[in-house]
Amino acid sequence: MIIVTPRYTIIEDGAINKIEEILKKLNLKNPLVITGKNTKKYCRFFYDIVYYDEILNNLEIELKKYTAYDCVIGIGGGRSIDTGKYLAYKLGIPFISVPTTASNDGIASPIVSIRQPSFMVDAPIAIIADTEIIKKSPRRLLSAGMGDIVSNITAVLDWKLAYKEKGEKYSESSAIFSKTIAKELISYVLNSDLSEYHNKLVKALVGSGIAIAIANSSRPASGSEHLFSHALDKLKEEYNLNINSLHGEQCGIGTIMMSYLHEKENKKLSGLHEKIKMSLKKVDAPTTAKELGFDEDIIIEALTMAHKIRNRWTILRDGLSREEARKLAEETGVI
């Protein structure tokens, strides 16, 4: 297996001004930029630009329109980055990630989530994260990023469980890397004034994405908490719910509950879910169904169907009954 990780990673104030320098180092001369209408202002150069929604509205794109380019640069939030990764993968050319916020580990991972189920592509060849820009992004997006990082804790616990109970392939190095990233950010959040939170968060999200690339699987960063989040997404669509909850917010609440389930089976983990909850509260991320915008019944239904979302063995095993789901949500304070 060939492990592809970024050749260049720049995380600093003013990093966006180094795009041309990185292009030269990579011997890339004709990039196509994918961005959004709100982030076009950061494209301060004379490259061709396409808005991400033009691609998303037609995923079966005519690739011959873009064959003259030798790389794709995604500048913006999750949709710009994911769309850029997808297009670069389809074209067979490198992708450079230039995030303008830090709401999930998609900024560095080889995973695209523009449709479900998500799928693996090539990891970015370079990541250029301008912390000056990211610091000014909406606070809510940065809070959601914390939710995506804490999910590494339960993702790794689930992965190890699948290894023990189902003989699933397991990478100790990738698991330790992913878990350590999450624990260090939690420790920083709980023991600081958060003055460097945006900087620490970006580095954690980049590390999480690299852990996925090393494992060649989303396992180090996606477990039962992500199944719960995807179940919520499915119910939002099924019931036509006008709820604008973010992926990281949903994963954060999922992590509170799933870590509690792991605690019940392993006394060494005692207090884990409370620690995770406190870290989420510290960055103003939601920790209850009400704060997330969901009725109790939707949370319970999502918990009962989460194990069916994809073929992935987790602490949910063969599923929770409605009674078990309600008890879990109540005991963790989610409802």
Curated annotation (Swiss-Prot):
Record-listed substrate binding positions: 105, 148, 230
Gene Ontology molecular functions: glycerol-1-phosphate dehydrogenase (NAD+) activity; glycerol-1-phosphate dehydrogenase (NADP+) activity; metal ion binding
Cofactor: Zn(2+)
EC number: 1.1.1.261
Cofactor, how bound (note): Binds 1 zinc ion per subunit.
A GO CC annotation given for this chain: cytoplasm
Catalysed reaction equations from the record: sn-glycerol 1-phosphate + NAD(+) = dihydroxyacetone phosphate + NADH + H(+); sn-glycerol 1-phosphate + NADP(+) = dihydroxyacetone phosphate + NADPH + H(+)
Binding-site positions, Zn(2+): 148, 226, 247
Residues engaged in binding NAD(+): 78-82, 100-103, 109
Keywords attached to this entry: Cytoplasm, Lipid biosynthesis, Lipid metabolism, Metal-binding, NAD, NADP, Oxidoreductase, Phospholipid biosynthesis, Phospholipid metabolism, Zinc
UniProt subcellular location: Cytoplasm
Principal location class: cytoplasm
Pfam family, one: Fe-ADH_2
Gene3D superfamilies linked to this entry: 3.40.50.1970, Dehydroquinate synthase-like - alpha domain
A GO BP annotation: phospholipid biosynthetic process
InterPro entries recorded: G1P_dehydrogenase_arc, G1PDH, Glycerol_DH
Protein purpose: Catalyzes the NAD(P)H-dependent reduction of dihydroxyacetonephosphate (DHAP or glycerone phosphate) to glycerol 1-phosphate (G1P). The G1P thus generated is used as the glycerophosphate backbone of phospholipids in the cellular membranes of Archaea.
Protein's recorded name: Glycerol-1-phosphate dehydrogenase [NAD(P)+]
Taxonomic classification: Archaea, Methanobacteriati, Methanobacteriota, Methanomada group, Methanococci
